[in-house]
Design a protein with these regions (language model features):
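Phosphate/dinucleotide-binding and metal-coordinating scaffold of catalytic cores
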Residues: 1-178
């Protein structure tokens, strides 16, 4: 269903800068109900690609996993540990290139995305690379051969090394969900 709407434009208050403007949009209540939004569960995620704005209901970690698996997507579950303690779980939908994190530790230094509770695919890719030997390291090819990896593919390196680094006690497991 497609509808045309007008923006509600007003002046911003509070700590907004001088002459700041706010923009709002009234949405049909049937759409809101169909999305499962309620006064108690009203948080949404906004995505902007330069031309379109997409509004989706914010999913819990379990809902994200279920929706991705139900859609038949390739989903990876990464468990992040500090020593023996499970600190976070990352669900990576490789089909849609979306990611969801469930933080289980209070210390942001033990979390894969720090204080970022809503990482995007690029954040995930950066995290994977951070848990690997740098691409520019001398002797990289010999290292990859020694661990049995054909090329510089962060996820494959992590599968072999558990993403262990000399400077911390963090490590990862990777599981493909069916």
């Amino acid at each position: 269903e497609t509808r045309t709407a007008n923006l509600i434009i007003g002046t911003s208050g509070g700590t907004a800068g001088k002459n700041a403007t706010s923009y709002k949009l009234a949405l049909p209540s049937t759409w809101i109900k169909e999305m499962g939004l309620t006064p108690e569960q009203r948080q949404v995620e906004l995505r902007f690609d330069g031309a379109s704005i997409v509004i989706t209901r914010t999913l819990s970690f379990a809902e994200f996993l279920e929706a991705s698996r139900h859609a038949g997507h390739k989903v990876l579950l990464l468990s992040c540990y500090s020593g023996d303690a499970l600190c976070a779980r990352i669900a990576a939908d490789e089909t849609e290139k979306t990611v969801c994190v469930e933080n289980l530790a209070a210390d942001c230094l033990k979390l894969p995305f720090g204080n970022n509770k809503n990482p995007i695919w690029e954040d995930y890719q950066h995290f994977l690379e951070d848990r690997c030997i740098p691409k520019t390291r001398a002797g990289l090819q010999e290292y990859l051969e020694a661990i049995g990896v054909d090329g510089y593919e962060p996820l494959e390196i992590i599968r072999k090394t558990q993403g262990r680094m000399a400077e911390d006690d963090l490590w990862l497991t990777v599981e493909e969900l069916k």
